[in-house]
Amino acid sequence: MKKISLIIPCYNEAPALPLFAKELNKVITQMNKETHDYSFEVLLIDDGSTDETKDVMKDLCHRSNLCENPSDARPSATDKTTSNKTAVSDASFPENIAYKYISFSRNFGKEAAMYAGFSNASGDYVAVMDADLQDPPTLLPEMIHILETEDYESVATRRVTRKGEPPIRSFFARQFYKLINKISDANVVDGARDFRLMKREMVDAILAMSEYNRFSKGIFGWIGFKTKWIEFENVNRIAGETKWSFFGLFKYAVNGIINFSETPMSVASSFGIFCTILSFAMLLFFFIRKLIFGDPVAGWPSLVCIILFIAGLQFLCMGIMGKYIAKTYTEVKERPHYIVSDSDIEDIKKIK
């Protein structure tokens, strides 16, 4: 029997988690009617949530454990959170699914949560999914079938529409994908989700890339395993609110470009060379003009504009170089990707 590990990063997803579990359990129950060749491990990663997410996780783990060991019945961890408890109790748990949780000491970010999931997943196949049901669990059977029957190491998903997303956000997202594919050596598909199912060898390759500044979409493309893409219509989140602001997405995009491309540094160097050549050309022009025509070089406003323009370019280039230096600095410090404060996984590494 093959084991499939599902990594679910969560940040303030208490309202969505019970609905996600209910939908996932329904899909697995339907699969069990056709085959009993798979067991499922669901790793719920609490990324320093400030709501009841951790309690809901514990309740899900407890209830899935009861399906495997009915004699272990005891009070639920979330009896005090009645609304979420009721939603969790509505979910029917198949016997071949085990929920486990990992809770961080603070918010380390989705990339750290995914890395924690990869580090602790024990399945033959490993998938990453969002808890808000924007990654439809109904695609899992098809993804599993493709890995089992076709010559692929990964099955990934991409949105073909951005229905429900602000137009300006959609525009900048499309431009980002075009830009990063032109200037980097990582193939990042437009509309790609983190939702993908991978064989163990691909997961091991991801774990071998242990850098602190992570951009998983770039890592998935950089390691180069054969991937089949499944397209689907955009799905709105089932509950809660998005954690990604426009500024947060912009910062994420900048980090992705810096992590997988040296082009910004090359552009900064080119600007420096261009400005140097231009300044020498202007000096030569004004010198010859003075010698031949005797014209005075007047116009302090134009001089101020030129100085400000050059200064702006210099600060831009310094900022680009500063970003690379800052990334190098964080890598050299070798701080842990995350710190675990609580988990029901016995042999988990608390700091990694």
Predicted regions and their residues:
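Cell-envelope/extracellular polymer assembly enzymes that use nucleotide-activated donors
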Residues: 3-5, 41
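Short, well-formed alpha-helical segments that are part of the catalytic scaffolds
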Residues: 13-32
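Short beta-strand/loop segment that forms part of the nucleotide-sugar
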Residues: 32-48, 102-103
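A conserved acidic beta->alpha catalytic loop
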Residues: 46-55, 133-134
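Conserved donor nucleotide-binding strand/loop of the catalytic core
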Residues: 54-74, 79-80, 84-120, 158
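Acceptor/aglycone-binding surface of glycosyltransferases and processive sugar-polymer synthases
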Residues: 98-106, 110-120, 125, 137-219, ...
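Hydrophobic helical membrane-anchoring modules
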Residues: 217-352
